[in-house]
């Protein structure tokens, strides 16, 4: 089992997350033992290469020119190793988040069941609730930071896979999308909104991810944050208009994807954007 499932209320979420991870092949990006698919010439060359490597075996060799050595990053073996490491870190990150959710639910339950004979005044209850929320917030932020570290490592491992053909495989794109999405949510919750923008932009470039309205919702929010920061710091107008434009583009796209162009929600957003005087959209 990848995730702790101590509380029934979170069991469904935990199982859904586990199922999502289990679909990622079992940690292999591409089969390595594919001799059956090789031509006779390729088999012959492979045998000759193995013989040459055996003759020239020198574990202490350190190449001065790294270019030739870097070619191993294009191999299936290297790609599979990096894919497994990325998957392992992704699983650890998700597991960290799920365990924290279980802990929060258990903590709230235990606090609610405690007898409060010493609480005689309403303000005492308010003060206690505030303390409890501070504890929950602190634990949530710690878990999200720990998870973010795992997700960042997963991204780094996937970035190491240089073979363009392997990067186009559905297994690679699936894991990359899952890691990006989890990284974005954790980073956003840690109040690092500007940092989510480049990863969000990369996310919507993968296959049909652009059709997911939450990605545009997050982008609109992040660009809105940047716009407001420019206002507060009295930054350059060109940057202000740039962020405002991008905010409106993604706000409109998120509304279109969720509600449809014929919906009252979409028409309302069009009016809001037109009042923003950045882009004009025909209703």
PLM region descriptions:
Residues 4-11:
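Boundary at the C-terminal end of the N-terminal hydrophobic targeting segment
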Residues 21-28, 37-54, 77-135, 170-186, ...:
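Amphipathic alpha-helical repeat scaffolds of TPR domains
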Residues 35-38, 68-82, 118-124, 136-140, ...:
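Flexible helix-coil transition and linker loops at the boundaries of alpha-helical arrays
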Residues 54-70, 141-160, 189-201, 243-244:
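Helix-turn-helix repeat elements of alpha-solenoid scaffolds
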Residues 77, 102, 109, 116, ...:
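Surface-exposed, polar/charged faces of alpha-helical domains
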Residues 165-209:
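Alpha-helical adaptor scaffolds
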Residues 237-283:
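Terminal, low-structured helical/coil segments at or just beyond the last alpha-helical repeat
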